[in-house]
Swiss-Prot record:
Keywords: Cell membrane, Membrane, Protein transport, Translocation, Transmembrane, Transmembrane helix, Transport. Component of the Sec protein translocase complex. Heterotrimer consisting of SecY (alpha), SecG (beta) and SecE (gamma) subunits. The heterotrimers can form oligomers, although 1 heterotrimer is thought to be able to translocate proteins. Interacts with the ribosome. May interact with SecDF, and other proteins may be involved. It comes from Metallosphaera sedula (strain ATCC 51363 / DSM 5348 / JCM 9185 / NBRC 15509 / TH2). NCBIfam families: PRK09400.1-1 (NF006906). The gene is secE. InterPro entries: Prot_translocase_SecE_dom_sf (IPR023391), Translocase_SecE/Sec61-g (IPR001901). It is a single-pass membrane protein. Disulfide bonds: none annotated. This is Protein translocase subunit SecE. Essential subunit of the Sec protein translocation channel SecYEG. Clamps together the 2 halves of SecY. May contact the channel plug during translocation.
Length: 59
């Protein structure tokens, strides 16, 4: 399978995904946004605490 065939198949796959996908309604979008931001905040806080602990322990 050549490069042109791969690109053609990839384009067809993307078309199929786009045709099946649907836009989320406003409430689902905001729920996803809130969950994403909470997880991002949690991971950032965890990384900060780990860095703080290592800087205190190692001087």
């Amino acid at each position: 399978m050549g490069l042109a065939d791969r690109i053609k198949k990839l384009r067809e796959d993307w078309k199929r995904i786009i045709s099946v996908a649907k836009k989320p309604d406003k409430s689902m979008f905001y729920l996803n946004l809130r969950v994403t931001l909470i997880v991002l905040l949690f991971v950032g806080l965890l990384a900060f605490l780990v860095q703080l602990a290592f800087s205190i322990l190692l001087g």
